[in-house]
């Protein structure tokens, strides 16, 4: 058997679809005159490509509806985290298909390209042929990531070092987090590129981040004789794994009664949190790390305010790069996040506001600012709003909850879990409120 031949019993667990197998019409006839199956496949392909970008079910369904309406059909879709079942109807005929993805992720650059495609199709799609539509989608689908693994590692390093400062850490914690998160996310990206399973990627990345933090901290301590209390910053090194995107989109989907998608996204986020925190706890037990309070920093309230602005920007910018945002998009999200997250922290520190209420106002601010900015830059709302509030997701609280529960300190663990839950619930509520106020299409059902 030649090296080019593949045995009949070898195949991908999730088989790839050759979309051109469905094309039977010529490349001259407008797509609106193609048969039902050809048009329905276009609807499904757009939907599954949108879903692969990590966006919520409302946006996926809206895109499928635009394509269906442009091609003269009615579409009804049931959308989950990694699968779509949909039916297209036209002239007393119907075509039902089920499509699925092997995994899920976030790609804001591809999402932006698909949004532009949708606008073009809505305006002039009636004159396109089936072949032209597939060619445009092929071009979008074949687009590669904007950043190499080492770049994504640096983005996580920047984000987590800024994150740990916002949590109360100092220069030692920031330096060690930079190293730990950088190595951890680099390893995670390499494993993802090799199509490793979800649990393995999470476990190895978190363990690598914690161990890299410990090694760098021991080196700093040996060179500069710093306090052992700085070891508490190891939590910050693993915060790149926190699934802020599915957490927030879960709440958005539930608000639109897309129960399947909302619950699946919530379950996916909980799985990641559970595996990451348990692995972090196991590593901490093995190498004797403890999540103590950070050492107080000798900074005035004004200095905190002035430093929180650039730290929040760097954190959001780094997370946006991890979501494959281009530099301009990441900068836009970073500027919004700098204002929204600094406002949240100042409301807690100076206004003595409960953390949940401050999270709501911070997310509301981010949503309102994004609504203003997107009219000028044209980016999808979700690609700048969610990255701008991911930094507000209380990964530290979640880890401390699991750490204490693991030590059977149930009351302390429950306290941290309650604090985390309140913030996690209020973050999507803030975005939902902003969306209701600024988006007429979102405001109404149907």
What are these regions (language model features)?
Residues 155-163, 181-188, 208-209, 311-319, ...:
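Hydrophobic, membrane-inserted alpha-helices
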Residues 73, 89-111, 120-127, 142-153, ...:
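Alpha-helical transmembrane segments and immediately membrane-proximal extracytoplasmic
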Residues 233-238, 249-253, 257-272, 305-307, ...:
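C-terminal transmembrane helix-loop-helix hairpin of multi-pass membrane proteins
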Residues 164-180, 229-243, 295-311, 352-365, ...:
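Structural signature of hydrophobic alpha-helical transmembrane segments
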Residues 240-248, 268-352:
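Generic multipass alpha-helical transmembrane bundles of integral membrane proteins
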Residues 145-249, 323, 327:
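Core alpha-helical transmembrane segments of integral membrane proteins
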Residues 219-229, 287-301, 404-415:
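Membrane-interface helix termini and inter-helical loops of multi-pass transporters
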Residues 1-134, 139:
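Soluble N-terminal domains of membrane-associated systems
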């Amino acid at each position: 058997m030649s090296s080019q031949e593949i045995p009949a019993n070898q195949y991908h667990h999730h088989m790839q679809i050759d979309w051109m197998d469905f094309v039977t019409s010529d490349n001259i006839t407008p797509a609106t005159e193609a048969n039902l199956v050809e048009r329905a496949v276009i609807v499904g392909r757009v939907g599954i490509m949108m879903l692969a970008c990590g966006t919520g079910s409302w946006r996926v369904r809206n895109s499928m509806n635009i394509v269906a309406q442009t091609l003269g059909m009615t579409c009804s879709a049931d959308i989950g985290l990694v699968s779509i079942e949909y039916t297209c109807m036209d002239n007393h005929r119907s075509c039902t298909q089920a499509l699925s993805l092997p995994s899920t992720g976030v790609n804001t650059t591809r999402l932006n390209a698909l949004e532009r495609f949708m606008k073009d199709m809505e305006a002039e799609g009636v004159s396109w042929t089936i072949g032209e539509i597939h060619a445009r989608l092929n071009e979008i689908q074949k687009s590669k990531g904007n950043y190499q693994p080492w770049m994504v590692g640096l983005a996580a390093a920047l984000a987590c070092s800024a994150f740990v400062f916002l949590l109360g850490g100092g220069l030692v914690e920031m330096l060690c987090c930079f190293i730990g998160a950088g190595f951890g996310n680099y390893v995670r990206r390499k494993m993802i590129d090799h199509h490793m399973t979800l649990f393995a990627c999470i476990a190895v990345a978190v363990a690598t981040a914690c161990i890299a933090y410990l090694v760098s901290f021991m080196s700093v301590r040996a060179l500069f004789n710093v306090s052992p209390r700085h070891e508490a910053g190891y939590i910050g090194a693993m915060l790149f794994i926190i699934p802020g995107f599915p957490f927030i989109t879960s709440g958005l989907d539930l608000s639109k009664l897309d129960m399947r998608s909302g619950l699946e996204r919530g379950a996916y986020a909980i799985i990641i949190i559970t595996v990451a925190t348990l692995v972090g706890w196991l590593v901490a037990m093995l190498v004797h790390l403890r999540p103590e309070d950070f050492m107080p920093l000798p900074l005035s309230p004004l200095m905190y305010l002035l430093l929180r602005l650039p730290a929040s920007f760097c954190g959001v910018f780094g997370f946006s790069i991890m979501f494959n945002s281009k530099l301009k998009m990441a900068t836009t999200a970073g500027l919004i996040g700098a204002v929204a997250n600094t406002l949240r922290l100042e409301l807690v520190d100076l206004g003595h506001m409960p953390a949940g209420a401050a999270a709501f106002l911070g997310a509301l601010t981010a949503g309102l600012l994004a609504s203003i900015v997107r009219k000028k830059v044209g980016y999808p709302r979700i690609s700048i709003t969610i990255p701008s509030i991911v930094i507000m997701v209380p990964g530290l609280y979640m880890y401390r909850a699991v750490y204490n529960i693991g030590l059977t300190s149930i009351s302390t663990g429950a306290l941290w879990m309650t604090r985390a839950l309140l913030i996690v619930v209020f973050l999507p509520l803030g975005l939902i409120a902003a969306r209701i106020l600024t988006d007429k299409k979102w405001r109404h059902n149907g």
